[in-house]
UniProtKB/Swiss-Prot annotation:
Pathway: One-carbon metabolism; tetrahydrofolate interconversion. Keywords: ATP-binding, Ligase, Nucleotide-binding, One-carbon metabolism. One of its GO terms (molecular function) is ATP binding. This is Formate--tetrahydrofolate ligase.
Length: 565
């Protein structure tokens, strides 16, 4: 227990009583034939084996509640905590609810975050296993990615029948770890028997196109088709080369055949949760797997899900990428805001965020206002969830609620860290979300797919970020020409941008104006079905911080994890 006698997330999770996952599945209406046990408290669900109870009336798919946030502090603002707490409160109100979340990436767990399963009494369990290797999905995705690149390099070594140009590879090997030293490497050294030397590099697994394909596939057949469409490089004639050209989409699908099934776990309060897939929202599309979301909608009346980082990133990608693939457009959106994030955007230094400062709240409110207006552009008025921290004062919370009312949006303080787990800390938020679910709305995408790639990017940076315009580098302009030539311009755009600012400069907080977003490169993800626009200095292989969270982690003499926050 910590020095202030407040239990850590890990201590709370380890003291919680879990129900056997078979009981959770049965209570959620999942037939036993569809449940594949991974120990006592985890299971995979095979959607192909799900059956409706005999004699039960055909039910409509569940409504989606999307949880997003204002621009975060480095520690995050508690989207997962709020997602879990909200779902528990909806279940407490008698609603048939299920959660759909992303799986944590090991790199950030050992780096900055220390864990990513919610917090306090609003967590998904078993916390340690989910945060570490879970059911092995990320291992399978990493293996499929690296198998592809081993097969590509072997093809080049064995005679290169496809005429692949090693200088024009667009696909990298991956590792589920933050490791800056692997961003740029040279492979194939050591003589003729060791392969063809070429420049290469590693991305983090969550940035892999196979992760994106995994999370956007509708079933295993669609997964196989999407894998086949992946472009991994170009020929010497500058023609794209795909996985199908190499003929290994079947082998990659085989490596993912178990991983593609969603993982079932539970919250501290016993609410069922599907935790599956995990692309980052700053360098990928930031949403859990579509299969998990659709499975949850089949089983529950309300599905509470989240999209990574702020609404300018994860929520925009949910609306413009994920919701285009299948009918998962949200019926309600929750924007998580915190007093500390508003203060940071109001100019307060990180080491003084715990000090009361209503004036800084007012100065930082422009950031939250822009996120509110952004969500409204999709035809939905958000509900603001004020995620309460122990250092928040009543005056600060009252000011923020009054400010939200002045902006014309419903808001509620969510005390789900300390009063979650089936407690009443999220009851007011749940009531406002239920009202929002019944309110009329008219969902719309931010842009039509018929727009040019330049105009799609311009629309996003002007409408979502508040930028004056966009500047394309010379390499990006060359890539635009390739995209047009190859018939890929009809795909949506996935912006890769810092999560800390509306701009591509992480230091410009609040709601900056008078800036230009700089696109340094464009990467067509033809399997996933979107074009990644790399902006600013955002990296697809992060580095570890100066003091990694791993330094606080250990196990006791029984092997029980310590220090996972």
């Amino acid at each position: 227990m910590s020095d202030n006698n407040v239990m850590s997330d890990l201590e709370i999770a380890q003291r919680a009583t879990m129900r056997p996952i078979g009981d959770i599945a049965a209570a959620a209406g999942i037939n036993a034939d569809a449940v594949e046990l991974y120990g006592r408290y985890k299971a995979k669900i095979d959607p192909a084996k799900l059956i409706d109870p005999a004699g039960a009336p055909k039910r409509l798919p569940g409504k989606v509640v999307l949880v997003s946030a204002m621009s975060p502090t480095p520690a995050g603002e508690g989207k997962s905590t709020t997602t879990v707490g909200l779902a528990d409160s909806l279940a407490r109100a008698g609603r048939n609810v299920m959660i759909a979340l992303r799986e944590p990436s090991l790199g950030p767990v050992l780096g900055m975050k220390g864990g990513a399963t919610g917090g306090g009494y609003s967590q998904v369990l078993p916390m340690e296993e989910i945060n570490l290797h879970f059911t092995g999905d990320f291992h399978a995705i990493t293996s499929a990615n690296n198998a592809l690149m081993a097969l590509v390099d072997n093809h080049i070594f064995q005679g290169n029948e496809l005429n692949i140009d090693p200088r024009r590879m667009t696909f990298k090997r991956v590792l589920d770890m933050n490791d800056r030293s692997l961003r740029e490497v040279i492979i194939g050294l050591g003589g003729p028997a060791q392969g063809v030397p070429r420049q290469d590099g590693f991305d983090i697994t969550v940035a892999s196109e196979i992760m994106a394909v995994f999370c956007l596939a509708t079933d295993i057949a669609d997964l196989r088709a999407r894998l086949g469409r992946i472009t991994f490089g170009y020929t010497y004639d500058r023609e794209p080369v795909t996985v199908a050209d190499l003929g290994v989409q079947g082998a990659l699908t085989m490596l993912l055949r178990d991983a593609i099934k969603p993982n079932l776990v539970q919250t501290i309060a016993g609410t069922p949760a599907l935790v599956h897939g995990g692309p980052f929202a700053n360098i990928a599309h930031g949403c859990n797997s579509l299969i998990a979301t659709q499975t949850a909608r089949r089983l529950a009346d309300i599905v509470v899900t989240e999209a990574g980082f702020g609404a300018d990133l994860g929520a925009e990608k949910f609306m413009d990428i994920k919701a285009r693939v299948a009918g998962v457009a949200p019926s309600a959106v929750v924007l998580v805001a915190t007093v500390r994030a508003l203060k940071m955007h109001g100019g307060v230094a990180k080491d003084r965020l715990q000090e009361p400062n209503v004036e800084a709240l007012a100065a930082g409110s422009a950031n939250l206002r822009r996120h509110i207006r952004n969500v409204e552009k999709f035809g939905i008025t958000p509900v603001v969830a004020v995620n309460k921290f122990a250092t928040d004062t009543p005056e600060e919370l009252d000011w923020l609620l009054e400010w939200c009312a002045g902006e014309g949006v419903q808001a509620a303080v969510a005390d789900v860290w300390g009063r979650g787990g089936g407690g009443d800390g999220g009851d007011e938020l749940a009531a406002k979300v239920l009202a929002a679910l019944e309110a009329p709305h008219s969902f719309r995408h931010l842009y039509p797919l018929e727009l040019s790639v330049e105009d799609k990017i311009r629309t996003i940076v002007q409408e979502m970020y508040g930028a004056d315009g966009v500047d394309f580098s010379v390499p990006a302009l060359k890539r635009l020409a390739e995209i047009e030539k190859n018939g890929w311009a009809g795909m949506p755009v996935c912006m890769a941008k810092t999560q800390y600012s509306f701009s591509d400069d992480a230091t410009r907080l609040g709601a900056p104006k008078g800036f230009t977003v700089h696109v340094r490169d464009l990467i067509p993800k033809t399997g996933a079905g979107f074009i990644v626009a790399l902006t600013g200095a955002v990296m697809t292989m992060p580095g570890l911080p100066k003091v990694p969270a791993a330094l606080r982690m250990d196990v006791d003499d029984t092997g029980k994890p310590l220090g996972l926050f």
